Amino acid sequence: MAHLLLLHGPNLNLLGTREPEVYGRTTLAQIDAALVDRAQAAGHVLHCLQSNAEHVLVERIHAAREDGTAYILINPAAFTHTSVALRDALLGVGLPFVEIHLSNPHAREPFRHHSYLSDKADGVICGFGADSYRLALEAVIARLERDA
């Protein structure tokens, strides 16, 4: 049994109502519930946290090094394009991570094309709406089974 950490960045608490044509109508609570259930069915525990504050996400990443977290799944949202702090935190704890995006940032405004995390992530899954999270979790579960 592995402990997994799912982090959601700024404004993702508004999922379901914020720009549904871009992000869909599925709420964050619905995404989290489905992923917690899927992780549990695979014999793992998934812990979820959403924050609009960069330092809260950084502190949770730091805590992951000591609390038995095996893998981090992260949708950094707008912090993707700005946060050296998240990058440094992820590198500092040395845990594998997957970067997730609901939309395809490469098909959007040019300022969204750069990620401070992608080159260090085990993988990046984007553009599949709420399914991006499910696909990321399935990839992590497969990786854990392969490495067991």
Swiss-Prot record:
The keyword Lyase applies. One of its GO terms (molecular function) is 3-dehydroquinate dehydratase activity. One of its GO terms (biological process) is aromatic amino acid family biosynthetic process. It is an enzyme of class 4 (lyase). InterPro entries: DHquinase_II, DHquinase_II_CS, DHquinase_II_sf. Keywords: Amino-acid biosynthesis, Aromatic amino acid biosynthesis, Lyase. It comes from the Bacteria. The record marks 18 as: Transition state stabilizer. Pfam families: DHquinase_II. It catalyses: 3-dehydroquinate = 3-dehydroshikimate + H2O. Pathway: Metabolic intermediate biosynthesis; chorismate biosynthesis; chorismate from D-erythrose 4-phosphate and phosphoenolpyruvate: step 3/7. Its EC number is 4.2.1.10. Catalyzes a trans-dehydration via an enolate intermediate. Homododecamer. NCBIfam families: aroQ, PRK05395.1-1, PRK05395.1-2, PRK05395.1-3, PRK05395.1-4. Belongs to the type-II 3-dehydroquinase family. HAMAP family: AroQ. This is 3-dehydroquinate dehydratase. It comes from Xanthomonas euvesicatoria pv. vesicatoria (strain 85-10). The lineage of its organism: Bacteria, Pseudomonadati, Pseudomonadota, Gammaproteobacteria, Lysobacterales.
